[in-house]
Amino acid sequence: MTLDEIAKLAGVSKTTASYVINGKAQKYRISEKTQHKVMAVVEQYNFRPDHAASALRAGNSRSFGLIIPDLENTSYARLAKLLEQNSRQAGYQILIACSDDDPQIEMAAAEALVSRRIDALFVASGIPSASEYYLKLQQSGTPVIAIDRALDDEYFSCVISEDFGAAFELTRSVLTQDVHSVGLVGALPELNVSREREQGFAMAVKQRGLPTTLGYGEHFNREEGRKVFAKWVANDQLPDAVVATSYTLLEGILDVLLEQPELMQKVRLATFGDNRLLDFLPIRVNSLPQQFELIADSALALALNASAKRYQTGIELIPRQLKVRT
């Protein structure tokens, strides 16, 4: 059943039928008699207007896309939930895809989302040449909002948490007088976010002139964190303090410590990210929680502006809050 058929059966114009069905009868002073005629046909044939088709004709779909690296990562899961809630409250749906930090999967997801005529795309990219790829996509008509991992701010809107300065402060928080060596457990060193965190780490350690050990996994996940840390332990190369560049990597470190609890007395830990469970561990772990609400609010504001043809380039830095556990 189409709108044309509804109008013919009700004996009114297509425009009049549309006004009645979409709740605009009072605005256009359509009589109650005409309203009843139209709605009687609507109810008889169980007609449902195709809002998606209407939105596409109007040039928008009232939907956003979101690509994140890992749905099991509590930080990204929290951010996805907030963006979905905020988008829904603004009258938008959000379509979510997971890249697993695989460039091919991410590009396929981006193309699939763009094919759905989304009004803007949020992405935490794991593509080494992400700015180049997403610039082509953006020039084809879909605004891109970078979250958590920045793109080239000359061309893109970016909302990220501070990385270089945060890594500096986090590292410095574990450099007590009894620390004589420091390690960094990270992943995907080719990503800009990884470089920023390593540089902040290096700057803090340089001030003390301490030897460092760097270990990088292939992904930001628990297993990779475990591999790096376990290798240090097996080779008798465990530093006095270790900084993890994500909470998921820290989980792998904690797995090793659970198996060898005597090591808890030999190492100080710090991590990007946070979890309430850290408050209950026998080992003290300093952490860097993100302000997810601020990130989600800022990202949505940028997306709404972009969908209204008011795209703004630049980086918005959301400060982190160092949590020192003593």
From Swiss-Prot:
GO MF, one term, reads: DNA-binding transcription factor activity
Provide this UniProt record's keywords sorted from A to Z.
Activator, DNA-binding, Repressor, Transcription, Transcription regulation
Q: What is this protein called?
A: Fructose operon regulatory protein
Task: Give the highest taxon in the source lineage.
Answer: Bacteria
Q: According to the record, what happens upon gene knockout?
A: Does not affect growth on glucose. Mutant shows a severe growth defect on fructose. In the absence of the gene, expression of the fru genes increases in glucose medium.
This entry's comment on induction and repression of expression is: Expressed at the highest levels in fructose media. Expression can be modulated by CRP in the presence of fructose and glucose.
**What SMART domains does the database record attribute to this sequence?**
HTH_LACI
Oligomer and partners: Homodimer.
Mind listing where the DNA-binding region sits, in residue ranges? 3-22
SUPFAM superfamilies (UniProt xref): lambda repressor-like DNA-binding domains, Periplasmic binding protein-like I
Q: What's the gene?
A: fruR
Q: What is any one GO biological process for this UniProt entry?
A: regulation of DNA-templated transcription
Span of domain HTH lacI-type: 1-58
User: What role does it play?
Assistant: Regulates the expression of the fruBKA (fru) operon, which encodes proteins involved in the import and metabolism of fructose. In the absence of fructose 1-phosphate (F1P), binds to the promoter region of fruB, interferes with the binding of the RNA polymerase (RNAP) to the promoter and represses the expression of the operon. In the presence of F1P, activates the transcription of the fru operon by facilitating the binding of RNAP to the promoter. Essential for the expression of the fru operon and thus for growth on fructose.
The activity regulation comment is: Interaction with F1P may induce a structural change in the DNA spacer region between the -35 and -10 elements, thereby facilitating RNAP binding to the promoter to trigger the transcriptional activation of the fru operon. Interaction with F1P does not release FruR from its binding sequence.
